Design a protein with these regions (language model features):
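Short, glycine/charged-enriched secondary-structure capping and boundary segments
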Residues: 24-27, 52-54, 74
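Short, acidic/small-residue loops that bind anionic groups at enzyme active sites
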Residues: 27-49, 57-64
Length: 103
């Protein structure tokens, strides 16, 4: 799947032992078939290694199992950033406002 040109995005969860996979990753082949990589927790070691060895930007965030109860706001953010590539700097989440400005 990592080297399949038809696959555009890979989500994977965290997991103890992710760091043990690093010596077995073929970074050259990943660079030849770039895609979006998204994970969290222990998967960060793999995300950082992919970036460090390929200059491909990786993403820390949602994994598929967390999409069951995703809010509309989070769904819009995810789609605009990673699917459509049309993200704006800021999408308002609610009509809340600060009573007193913070630091």
């Amino acid at each position: 799947m990592i080297y399949d040109e038809n696959v555009k995005m890979i989500f994977f969860g965290g997991g103890y032992g992710s760091v043990d996979l690093l010596p077995y990753i073929d970074y050259k082949r990943i660079k030849e078939t770039p895609k979006l990589f998204l994970s969290y927790s222990d998967g960060t070691s793999i995300l950082n290694a992919i970036y460090a060895n390929t200059d491909i930007i990786t993403y820390y965030g949602q994994t598929p199992g967390l999409f069951d109860n995703i809010s509309e706001y989070d769904k819009k953010q995810f789609v605009s950033h990673l699917v459509e590539g049309t993200a704006t700097d800021y999408i308002r989440n609610s009509d809340w406002h600060a009573i007193t400005e913070g630091c």
